[in-house]
Amino acid sequence: HTQTDSINTKILYRIEQTDSNNITNSDAIYNRPFIGVQKTRTAIGGYVEGNTNYFSEDGIIEGFSMELRRFNLFIYSSISRRIKFLSELEFEHGTKEIALETAQIDFTLNTAFNLRGGVILPQIGIFNANHDSPNWEFIDRPLSSTNIIPSTLSEVGFGVYGKLLKDNSIISYNLYISNGIGDGIVLNENARTSIPAGKSLEMFEEDNNGIPMLNGRISYALRSKGEVGISYYGGTYNS
């Protein structure tokens, strides 16, 4: 009891996950290094990614190069017992690119069924929802998560999500509708279908054709052993 009182008197304190055995890949946006602020319902967090590379291509050596690739800030707030807010702001390559990657409100009803809306992360594959650099033991993101699925892909939309907890396993699901990407997915300089080329700033303002895209993912996880899932992302993209 004395130790608990000591922790509560700190202005800033580390927030620990209390149900780590029930965390799946779709929970990664909340399973982050947050610092709580005393007597508030708000927490802040973030990470910095910097690296150095030695470039050599086709016998041509460019030598060493250093880069501050990402500087990300998180803000979390428990507005009420059932309503929580999360945002992520990313500064990439110094300040060359600034993006609001997440700004969502969750209405938590119970473990099996909840509502989510705002700037969300579509559940495509495993990496888009769990893209924070400190979570991975490699410097560059996988090609499948950059050239095929443009992590990080953010969209304006809303939907439902939840988990079914079993003795030794977890079944989780996400189902969203969103503005979706534009016709740049096929009308691009790459002369091929490219989801990254379909991204645009307009997708945060309005749907280019008035027909929402559909995204869904379902996964099965064995506690502390692994997770397998299948996802869908599709709809009408041309205007």
Model segments located where?
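Outer membrane beta-barrel
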Residues: 34-55, 62-183, 210-215, 219-227
